[in-house]
Design a protein with these regions (language model features):
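12-transmembrane solute porter fold
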Residues: 1-128, 133-165
Length: 168
């Protein structure tokens, strides 16, 4: 039950990020697209080091984990709506419907691929061998560490796109 509440913090962070960034325009959108993956990276790195540690489950032990989860959601909420708009704007008038429909397809594919990759990383990270508490701790470390690469990649792409846009 507690794990479900913790996972909901990402959704709450996403909502807060979307509300914060909903009224942005111009350069502020560029910043939101860059700050989003930075938040995601910080949250993932936080989870990389916080989750594998033994916790008593007390509120104060969970607060940093809660903040890291909310930070990941905040990052998605800041950047994602503006990225969707960019996809639709980049499509020609004849391809607008196709672009809109493909967004959902890409989201579903990314979710399925991410779940499969998470399972592979967790298993390779020790979830099964050595297993037990030690294996779970080790798997959590590798899982969040490997998945921290995704927002790092997002930062690089956002910076390159911003630099390209400025040079055009």
């Amino acid at each position: 039950l507690v794990a479900g509440y913790l996972a909901a913090l990402m959704g709450a962070g996403w909502t807060v990020g979307a509300v914060i960034s909903s009224g942005l325009s111009g350069r502020a959108i560029e910043r939101a697209i860059l700050v989003g993956p930075v938040c995601g990276l910080l949250g993932m790195l936080g989870l990389t080091f916080l989750v594998p540690e033994t916790s008593t489950g007390l509120f104060l032990d969970l607060v940093p984990i809660c903040l890291a989860l909310a930070l990941i959601g905040l990052g998605v909420g800041l950047a994602w709506p503006h990225l969707l708009i960019r996809v639709l704007k980049a499509a020609s008038a004849q391809e607008q419907e196709l672009a809109g429909a493909s967004i959902t397809t890409i989201q579903l594919f990314a979710t399925a691929s991410g779940a499969a990759l998470a399972g592979m990383v967790a298993n390779a990270g020790g979830l099964i061998d050595p297993g037990g508490v030690a294996g779970t701790r080790q798997a959590a470390y590798y899982l969040f560490g490997v998945f921290a690469v995704a927002p790092l990649f997002g930062i690089i792409v956002a910076r390159n796109c911003k630099a390209k846009k400025q040079s055009d």
